[in-house]
């Protein structure tokens, strides 16, 4: 899977971006994501994600992660975008690095654990997972923890 990482403000280290990419690659393998496929991950400030949240979701507040799934587009929108030899476009993840740092401190675990959590959480949304019912939440939580545990990113390991 091709991952396009955008960190124009240099909010993360190279190793942190590589960790996110490794987490997403591992999750894609576990989920059987078709190849070739592509997604982008953009790292923003709280002010920037606040603007994205207001413009695209109608919510006037910053948030931690937003997923924009290409598969949620209508058939007409998809027809002109996809050729057979083009990668399957999964979508875009937008992560607030500031909110990530705040939440890591609030939850008492490492920044890397929270960053990994936000990445896998958003990625699973791109694949159609949700947490609207207790059953959906349990399934999504189990998948998230499976991936994070693989990378030894457990709760409380500051």
Curated annotation (Swiss-Prot):
A Gene Ontology molecular function term of the record: metalloendopeptidase activity
Pfam families referenced in this protein's UniProt entry, alphabetically: YbeY
UniProt entry keywords in alphabetical sequence: Cytoplasm, Endonuclease, Hydrolase, Metal-binding, Nuclease, Ribosome biogenesis, rRNA processing, Zinc
Main function: Single strand-specific metallo-endoribonuclease involved in late-stage 70S ribosome quality control and in maturation of the 3' terminus of the 16S rRNA.
Compartments it resides in: Cytoplasm
Family designation: Belongs to the endoribonuclease YbeY family.
Binding site residues for Zn(2+): 121, 125, 131
Domain of life: Bacteria
Annotated InterPro entries: MetalPrtase_cat_dom_sf_prd, YbeY, YbeY_CS
Organism this protein belongs to: Exiguobacterium sp. (strain ATCC BAA-1283 / AT1b)
Protein EC: 3.1.-.-
Cofactor binding remark: Binds 1 zinc ion.
Descriptive protein name: Endoribonuclease YbeY
Swiss-Prot/TrEMBL GO biological process terms: rRNA processing
Gene3D superfamilies hit by this protein: Metalloproteases ('zincins'), catalytic domain
Gene this chain is encoded by: ybeY
Cofactor(s) essential for the protein: Zn(2+)
Any single Gene Ontology cellular-component annotation: cytoplasm
Main location group: cytoplasm
PANTHER family: ENDORIBONUCLEASE YBEY, CHLOROPLASTIC
């Amino acid at each position: 899977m091709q991952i396009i990482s955008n960190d124009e403000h240099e909010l993360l280290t190279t190793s942190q971006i590589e960790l996110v990419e490794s987490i997403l690659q591992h999750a894609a393998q576990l989920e059987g994501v078709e190849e070739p496929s592509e997604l982008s991950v953009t790292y923003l400030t709280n002010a920037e994600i606040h603007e994205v949240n207001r413009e695209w979701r109608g919510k006037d507040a910053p948030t931690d992660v937003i997923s924009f799934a290409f598969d949620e587009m209508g058939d007409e929108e998809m027809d002109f975008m996809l050729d057979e030899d083009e990668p399957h476009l999964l979508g875009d993840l937008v992560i607030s690095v500031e909110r990530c740092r705040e939440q890591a401190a609030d939850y008492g675990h490492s920044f890397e654990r929270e960053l990994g959590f936000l990445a896998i959480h958003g990625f699973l949304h791109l694949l159609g997972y949700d947490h609207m019912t207790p059953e959906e939440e349990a399934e999504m939580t189990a998948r998230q923890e499976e991936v994070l545990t693989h990378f030894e990113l457990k709760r409380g390991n500051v």
